[in-house]
């Protein structure tokens, strides 16, 4: 089982989206690469922590590759916009792919180079090592399962 972390705006929709993908075995939402230990949602929203709202995705490599997961992410984000997705604006909503296995860095870089041809503006999605990851509060976990009519910048129709 491998793990990768995705930032793509509000983590509620990104989590639901990846839960629907074959080969993804487990997800959680949290705050990634924070300046402070165990930040609260309010602290993250203030911008002080510089944390990203992120989804930890655990997946079976025999069923889906990292390259395919990146393509899936790019289906629901605009990788050319910094600190915003949909109506969500702030540094916590920046897009990124974050890794714990250093061999993933090259896969991500290579994929960005291939995908760049699809965009007239440069891709600004981050490709960085996970420095820390703190689980978000319980009410954020599986939010759109618990609240099917909740706000989401991703359309699931």
Swiss-Prot record:
It comes from the Bacteria. It is an enzyme of class 1 (oxidoreductase). The active site is at residue 10. InterPro entries: Met_Sox_Rdtase_MsrA_dom, Met_Sox_Rdtase_MsrA_sf, MsrA_MetSO_reductase. The keyword Oxidoreductase applies. GO terms for cellular component: cytoplasm. Gene3D superfamilies: Peptide methionine sulphoxide reductase MsrA. GO terms for biological process: cellular response to oxidative stress; protein modification process. Disruption phenotype: Decreased agglutination to sheep erythrocytes and survival in hamster lungs and increased sensitivity to hydrogen peroxide. It catalyses: L-methionyl-[protein] + [thioredoxin]-disulfide + H2O = L-methionyl-(S)-S-oxide-[protein] + [thioredoxin]-dithiol; [thioredoxin]-disulfide + L-methionine + H2O = L-methionine (S)-S-oxide + [thioredoxin]-dithiol. Its EC number is 1.8.4.11. One of its GO terms (molecular function) is peptide-methionine (S)-S-oxide reductase activity. Keywords: Oxidoreductase. Belongs to the MsrA Met sulfoxide reductase family. Has an important function as a repair enzyme for proteins that have been inactivated by oxidation. Catalyzes the reversible oxidation-reduction of methionine sulfoxide in proteins to methionine. HAMAP family: MsrA (MF_01401). This is Peptide methionine sulfoxide reductase MsrA. It comes from Mycoplasma genitalium (strain ATCC 33530 / DSM 19775 / NCTC 10195 / G37) (Mycoplasmoides genitalium).
